[in-house]
């Protein structure tokens, strides 16, 4: 009986290691969107009609499963375990189908997702001027974010802060009044631009990175299916 081809065995191991790394990247980027400051503290308080995080939640699940499958594939290849290879093949096929379906949905609903994001930001803009103690966490988080992004206010600039401006203006302050990106407001030199565009771009950029990785992995996954079938057949002939 013929043995398992060493070249295919090593290729399968390398493939699964790269596959595991890709899963780790997808998982980390998706979690950074879902659990980061923008996702957790800036977007979460607003109750938009559409859930902005459905695609992100799916990708967190996909990333975790890819890591498990990568580990399973490595072990199956090295130990020449037929059962592990079957599990790997079935799991990889399901992930591939899920990725394709999620990618199609995300692409066709791109404009609706952007509308939902914009609506959430508009809703949350009202929270900046609130005097309710329950909104202090959101206001503090946004104050730190606007300092990082070098902007002021969420939609309409500094006026979004209302009477709270005097309490949070320091993170809006601009280094120089002569700078074209700065303006005067209530006697303070602040950034002219609101944070609306910056937050939208940041969210969209991270989501694009994750989706690009997911689509790129689809081609690699097809190779993984072929490798696993060939390796499994050789194991049976051994």
From Swiss-Prot:
Query: Where does the source fall among the domains of life?
Result: Eukaryota
Enumerate the Cytoplasmic topological stretches: 1-9, 73-83, 232-238
Q: Which residues are glycosylated?
A: 118
- The residue ranges crossing the membrane are 10-33, 58-72, 84-109, 207-231
Task: List, alphabetically, the GO terms of the cellular component aspect.
Answer: plasma membrane
Q: Which InterPro entries match?
A: Tetraspanin/Peripherin, Tetraspanin_animals, Tetraspanin_CS, Tetraspanin_EC2_sf
**Record's subcellular location:** Cell membrane
Which residue ranges does the entry give as Extracellular-facing topology?
34-57, 110-206
Q: What does this protein do?
A: Structural component of specialized membrane microdomains known as tetraspanin-enriched microdomains (TERMs), which act as platforms for receptor clustering and signaling. Participates thereby in diverse biological functions such as cell signal transduction, migration and protein trafficking. Promotes ADAM17-mediated TNF-alpha processing through recruitment of ADAM17 to tetraspanin-enriched micro-domains (TEMs). Forms a complex with RICTOR and integrin alpha3/ITGA3 to mediate mTORC2 activation and AKT1 phosphorylation leading to cell migration.
Q: What is this protein called?
A: Tetraspanin-8
What is the originating organism of this protein?
Bos taurus
Instruction: Name the gene that codes for it.
Output: TSPAN8
């Amino acid at each position: 009986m013929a043995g398992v081809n060493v070249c295919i065995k090593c290729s399968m191991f390398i493939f699964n290691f790269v596959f595991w790394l890709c899963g780790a990247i997808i998982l980390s980027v998706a979690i950074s969107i879902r659990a980061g400051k923008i996702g957790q503290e800036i977007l979460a308080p607003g109750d938009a009609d559409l859930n902005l995080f459905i695609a992100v939640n799916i990708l967190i699940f996909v990333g975790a499963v890819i890591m498990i499958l990568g580990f399973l594939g490595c072990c199956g290849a090295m130990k020449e375990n037929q059962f592990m290879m079957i599990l790997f093949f079935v799991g990889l096929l399901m992930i591939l189908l899920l990725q394709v379906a999620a990618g199609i949905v995300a692409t066709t609903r791109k404009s609706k997702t952007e509308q939902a994001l914009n609506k959430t930001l508009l809703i949350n803009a009202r929270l900046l001027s609130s005097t309710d103690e329950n909104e202090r966490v959101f206001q503090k988080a946004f104050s730190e974010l606007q300092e990082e992004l070098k902007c002021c206010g969420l939609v309409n600039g500094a006026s979004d802060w209302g009477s709270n401006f005097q309490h949070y203006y320091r993170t809006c302050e601009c280094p120089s009044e002569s700078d074209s990106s700065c303006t005067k407001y209530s006697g303070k030199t602040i950034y002219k631009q609101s944070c609306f565009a910056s937050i939208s771009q940041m969210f969209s950029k991270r989501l694009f990175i994750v989706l690009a990785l997911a689509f790129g992995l689809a081609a690699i996954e097809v190779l993984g299916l072929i490798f696993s079938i060939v390796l499994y057949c050789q194991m049976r002939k051994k």
